[in-house]
Amino acid sequence: GHYYADGKFVRYADLTTVTEYCHDDLETVCHTIRNKLIAGVDKRLDADAPLGFLLSGGLDSSLVCAISALVLGKKIRTFAIGMDKDAIDLKYAREVADYIGAEHTEVLMTRQEVLDTLEEVISLLGTYDITTIRASMGMYLCCKAIHEKTDIRVLMTGEISDELFGYKYTDFAPSPEAFQQEAKKRVDELYMYDVLRADRCISANSLEARVPFGDLDFVKYVMSIDPAMKVNTYDMG
């Protein structure tokens, strides 16, 4: 983002331009990532309103939930959504919730609910990007249920991790530099895709989003890691 001062636009922070990679070894990198993520989660746990957690069962949201449960030292309230038939993702979210001892809520959506909400979601997103729309349907309906049926008003999410660490976007990148350029592009364009989805779906339901993986200190460090350490060398997607 930018702000206007002294007759010109000033960029708030350039998180993706790296002039020199850090020289930390793998053990140090892993240790630093862990500590910075914990710090990023911790600083976002202070809330005047009741706090909830979106839990998909994937690595990103699971880490945020697990760290939060440890830091707070009490049960956290997690929420997952899936179709009313064959909702495989709910299984993994339930396993994580059980493991960390969370107070877990499952929101089931029907095919008709998705169809009935489609036009509304497209309108609030302001985009016809198919992937963004598809990924937004569940989040919107989950946030709607949270707002209508609970007192939760602040939500922690696992967004931005995929763009930082590669996910499928950088699988089989031809070189470390190609990995870095793709990661830079993905982070620079966050406002057009994943962050757009989370921001619109959450705020449209009068909820506040908090994104620990977007912590400035965390992002700056991850982007400075030698991309050779992040390239997929396991020949698996």
Residue ranges of model-derived segments:
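N-terminal segments that mediate ammonia production and transfer
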Residues: 1-27
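ATP-dependent adenylate-handling active sites, centered on carboxylate activation for C-N bond formation
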Residues: 17-237
